Amino acid sequence: MSGAKSMSYAEMFRRADGCAFVPFVVAGDPDMETSLEIIRTLVDAGADALEVGFPFSDPIADGTSVQGADLRALRAGMTTEKCFQLIERVREFTSIPIGLLVYYNLIYRMGVDEFYRRAAEAGVTGILAADLPPEEASDALRAAEKYDIDQIFIVAPTTGSERLKRISEVSSGFHYLVSVMGVTGARSRVEDATIELIKRVKAEGSLPVMVGFGVSRPEHVRMLRDAGADGVIVGSAIIDVISGNLGDRELMLQRIHEMAGTLKAAGGSG
């Protein structure tokens, strides 16, 4: 791996001022070069870590914003290998953790061991396969341990105590909490069930908790911080800025920087 060495999630959480701000983007949306500049802008605006989605033709867990981003990236010619090349270029200017959010079919198609080997080579810190339950993750867990990559799983409001215990046993890095049931997208408020879920997961295990799906406003970040979340993952709100400014790259980057700065500040310890 060339470029900066990846910071661990543990170190990132130690360094974060309050609630960590972690933006999500789709690799190659709307094209490789613009995607790189978007990520650079997010890092410059204070992102504590990055979540990068690899575009997929049938993203079942994602709402219209991320589906649109996937489609733009695929139309721009993005492949799994080009996504890894993008990560390598990001590693040239930042050491913050980079997590992948992918569908297991992409991993399976390349071969589990080869996917994780290539991810480690590119500088990936953690991998979350959105449609991979822990009960079926033995190959992924083996590869993650082999290549020193954190394997992350989704925890939802419907996750029972026994399943949460199992997830806690095999996860590393952090727990990814789904803030609302259903697909991703910017929501207007934080549900009470999300706050209760944060408390339940924090009581169960020792891993930090990051909340995604629907986080889009400064007040969301403050509420989640106050409920005990260690970080927030913001995707659809940022992707909406991308899709709304495709004709003006400079304005797009300016608005992304402004949004990221506002959300980062909202999570501060005060």
Swiss-Prot record:
* InterPro entries tied to this protein: Aldolase_TIM, RibuloseP-bd_barrel, Trp_synthase_alpha_AS, Trp_synthase_suA
- The top EC class, named as a word, is lyase
Q: Name one Pfam family in it.
A: Trp_syntA
Q: What is its EC number?
A: 4.2.1.20
The record's active-site residues are 51 (proton acceptor), 62 (proton acceptor)
Name its pathway.
Amino-acid biosynthesis; L-tryptophan biosynthesis; L-tryptophan from chorismate: step 5/5
Alphabetized GO MF terms: tryptophan synthase activity
Keywords, A to Z, come to: Amino-acid biosynthesis, Aromatic amino acid biosynthesis, Lyase, Tryptophan biosynthesis
State a GO cellular component annotated for this protein. cytosol
State whether keyword Amino-acid biosynthesis applies. Answer: yes
Catalytic reaction list: (1S,2R)-1-C-(indol-3-yl)glycerol 3-phosphate + L-serine = D-glyceraldehyde 3-phosphate + L-tryptophan + H2O
Query: CDD domains recorded for this chain?
Result: Tryptophan_synthase_alpha
Subunit comment for this entry?
Tetramer of two alpha and two beta chains.
Please explain the role this protein plays, according to its UniProt record.
The alpha subunit is responsible for the aldol cleavage of indoleglycerol phosphate to indole and glyceraldehyde 3-phosphate.
The record's family statement is: Belongs to the TrpA family.
Designated name of the protein: Tryptophan synthase alpha chain
Provide the species name.
Methanothermobacter thermautotrophicus (strain ATCC 29096 / DSM 1053 / JCM 10044 / NBRC 100330 / Delta H) (Methanobacterium thermoautotrophicum)
Q: What is the lineage of its organism?
A: Archaea, Methanobacteriati, Methanobacteriota, Methanomada group, Methanobacteria
